[in-house]
Amino acid sequence: MEKTEHKNTYSFDADASKVLNLVIHSLYRHKDVFLRELISNASDALNKLREASYFDQELLEDNPELEILISLNKEKKILEISDNGIGMDEKELVENLGTVARSGTEKFLESLKDKKVDLIGQFGVGFYSVFMVADKVEVETRKAGTKKGYIWGSRGRDSFYVDELGESVSRGTKIRIYLKDNSEEFLDKFKLEHVVVTNSNHIAFPIYLIDEKGEKDQINSASAIWTKNKTEITDEEHQNFFRDVAHVGGKPWMIIHNKNEGSTEYINLLYVPSIKPFDLYNPDRRASVKLYIKKVFITEENVQLIPQYLRFLKGVVDCADLPLNISRETLQYNNALVKIKKSLTNRVLNELKKRADSNPEEYISGFWNNFGAVLKEGLCEAMPTDERERLFALCRFYSLKKEKLISLDEYIQDMHPEQKEIYCLCSTSFESAKNSPQLEGFVSRGLDVLFFTDPVDDFWISVSHEYKSYNIKSITRSSIDLDAFAELEKAGQEVQQHHDKEIDRLIAKMQEVLKDEVESVRISKRLTESPVCLAVPDGAMDIRMEKFMLEQKQLHSRSKKILEINASHPVIGKIIGKVDSPEVEDLIFLLYDQACILQGDEVRNPVRMSKALTRLLLMT
């Protein structure tokens, strides 16, 4: 910075002019942020005075109520932001506003590094964002404890001036903004209120808006309830804040309020709603956890404070410090964010586990029925084994035997002594699952099966297929082995026996007829009441997942399944007697189509099925 011939006029040096031009024209995406930056600076000034007044009460003079004022003059197109904070003397005014990208706050922090003070102006360029909307800016200021005031002025180009104002200036700083023609929107009272409430609602000092009639209204809450001790927050305060951040009805089902004082300092106040948002499964749904830095709103976009599978959470995370880009609009990726995300995830999973253990029924009705499917999305992601196990422990699945939702731990506790796997069945609904022929062999042996009926189940089961050393296995798999489990005795059950040669002839015939449809035909060990079912070869996609992939054009053709037949079923007995008859092919195709329908697979040739059925009906 070089002083010109005029004793009170200064020019920005060449590098500073470049930075200033960048700030005005390129740095910020939204013009609104200038107001956030100026309010943040005002908050810093008030904090400085409050801290300094602990040692010298006279600095408060006769004006101890610390506040920020915003006033407007539509006729002259002037917007003013003022505070009664620490203020600046001539030297500080020249240094702090005359040097772009140099922070007065940084110097003040150095002088008070051993004392706790809350300052949010980190970068020294935020002030200059005002020139996005201003033709000219004037700053009137008087430092607390001094008598002389000064004025700084600039058009945001190459120079600025500083003049003495005498002793008539109030303590603090007043910024007078002469708005550009394209920025007159900031003379609208409702626009100003919206910007302040969005970005600076929780600044610790009251912000008043003074309209042209001189009416003074406080437009911020001047309180960040998350900074209070959790025992000091009333139910009404929680309800009001939840309503503001969640934008959903009802009360919060669970509140998670913690302060982390480790290497990364932050406070979280998170809510789990009691009502499922209508857009929960919208892929474009925005995150609902807002990031603050020292009570100043930063963003709720492009920051992953929580994993996607916890997107039902609402609330705030307030950090002591995080590296932002120079505009404070976006975060720089760093290890602190990773630590915060991991810590928050652990805390939320722990709190959910406590509720699930202490009140299982209320956990299912209040949480799982609303957000269980979203939580299971996490099982599709790559994550540490311990996190996956904790996520599994929160899951609830419908039990065939108990006819209710249970945990995997409950399932394991009641497993057959010889059982080494957790058996499951993916289906579109409870009713279709209950009627699946695949269940028959498990029911006859007293084995429990879990029903997976959410669409997401088809995805995670191929990724997360083990819990506490137990494989989670679909009962549709061809490798399911039930030989180790004895069937329960059924009184009065008649079993039709056939010679091996007769069965072998039928299987050979079926494989010949269905050579283009199935991989193989074999005798089933799982069927007791149905004549046929389909089994999925190991390594192949589950039927429902394959159907989805075909619908999404991710697969071009269906895989061949294994057709299992119940050798003791009367229908199979009749077909054995007709293995050499002309209608045997129609019977075989109908059996295959029946198996497809029962397991949710499409009938590949409905015309063939219709004709075969018609021919057989004509024969009766």
UniProtKB/Swiss-Prot annotation:
Domain of life from the UniProt record: Bacteria
Cross-referenced Pfam families: HATPase_c_3 (PF13589), HSP90 (PF00183)
Subcellular location: Cytoplasm
Alphabetical list of PROSITE patterns matching this protein: HSP90
Keyword annotations of the record: ATP-binding, Chaperone, Cytoplasm, Nucleotide-binding, Stress response
Record region (A): 1-328
Signal peptide, first to last residue: none
GO molecular function: ATP binding; ATP hydrolysis activity; ATP-dependent protein folding chaperone; unfolded protein binding
HAMAP family on file: HSP90
Protein family per UniProt: Belongs to the heat shock protein 90 family.
Protein name: Chaperone protein HtpG
Organism: Neorickettsia sennetsu (strain ATCC VR-367 / Miyayama)
